[in-house]
Regions:
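C-terminal substrate-binding subdomain of Rossmann-fold SDR/epimerase-dehydratase oxidoreductases
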Residues: 138-271
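Conserved sequence/active-site signature of Rossmann-fold short-chain dehydrogenase/reductase
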Residues: 68-69, 120-122, 152, 162
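Conserved active-site region of classical short-chain dehydrogenase/reductase
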Residues: 42-50, 128, 160-163, 167
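Hydrophobic alpha-helix immediately C-terminal to the catalytic Tyr-X-X-X-Lys motif of short-chain
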Residues: 96, 100-104, 134, 209, ...
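Short glycine-/acidic-enriched loop or helix-start segments at secondary-structure transitions
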Residues: 29-30, 71-73, 124, 156, ...
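N-terminal Rossmann-like NAD(P)+-binding domain of SDR-like oxidoreductases, especially those catalyzing
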Residues: 1-120, 249, 253, 260, ...
Length: 271
């Protein structure tokens, strides 16, 4: 929505909690259309934070991304790891929103939680995501593109787990009073600001992921093996110990179960 429409809604309802999930997502498209990502992700998030400041929200939760870990080689990824080597424009915009949010939190003491999602999949997802593209290709007997010759791992996280993870944090705003309370905490030392991973904590081999889809559809994929694409990372894997300590929650859906649930929805929705 336009900023004016957004402002009217925010000032009308004056929510105590704001969960900001809107963004322009996707690594490859960000290389083609970087300005779209700058406007949507950076300016869009700035607009939300500015409005949150004006109504004194009790907790602002903002979606970030595992892509901010970039070339980080420490596995699993922890919130306290250094994140200065983003590999795509998309990842850079997400890292930028984290920095902007921290500055606002420091100056105006807005309690902000940045949530780094790991490869979210499931019903009602984006059609450009791997699971959608693989499913459509296999069903239509078209070749599916497999990057880096399939030598990739992803921490696939089912949408229900992401939603539950976010909801578990709603009433857990960061506070400077919590300094030193949790081990390996990402809580800022100067602001009520914290970063949290929401992931499945399992790295899944891409070819195993595809095989699980084939098994459910009882159809073999026609595969087109390709090189690693610009901006892509070879592996993602989350450490969610902080999420468990703070909110008592750990994502639990196995990828084969998630694929089965997705395909049931997909076949029904697309008939």
């Amino acid at each position: 929505p336009s900023v004016s429409i957004l402002s009217k809604s925010i000032f009308k309802f004056k929510p105590k909690i704001i969960i900001h999930l809107a963004a322009q997502a996707g690594v490859r498209y960000s290389i083609e259309k970087p300005r779209v990502y700058l406007n949507s992700n950076i300016i869009g998030t700035y607009n939300i934070i500015e409005l949150a400041k004006k109504i004194n929200v009790k907790h602002l939760l903002i979606a970030s991304s595992s892509s901010v870990y970039g070339a980080n080689k420490n596995l699993p990824f922890k919130e306290t790891d250094k994140t200065q080597t983003q590999l795509s424009i998309y990842a850079s915009t997400k890292k930028s929103t984290e920095s902007i949010a921290h500055s606002y939190s420091n100056i105006w003491k807005i309690p902000i939680s940045m949530l780094r999602f790991f490869t979210v999949y499931g019903p009602w997802g984006r059609p450009d995501m791997a699971l959608f593209k693989f499913t459509k290709g296999i069903m239509n007997k078209k070749k599916i593109d497999i990057y880096n010759n399939g030598k990739m791992y992803r921490d696939f996280t089912y949408i229900d787990d992401v939603v539950e993870g976010v909801c578990s944090l709603i009433n857990k705003p960061p506070s400077l009073k919590q300094l030193g309370k949790f081990k390996n905490d990402s809580l800022s030392t100067i602001a009520p600001f914290r970063i949290l991973n929401i992931g499945n904590t399992n790295k899944v081999y891409l070819l195993d992921f595809i095989s699980a889809i084939e098994k459910e559809l009882k159809t073999k994929a026609k595969r087109k093996y390709m090189s690693l694409q610009k901006g892509d990372v070879k592996i993602t894997l989350s450490n969610t110990n902080l999420l468990k300590k703070i909110a008592g929650y750990n994502p639990k859906t196995k990828y084969k179960t998630g694929i089965k649930k997705f395909l049931k929805w997909y076949l029904n929705y697309y008939n």
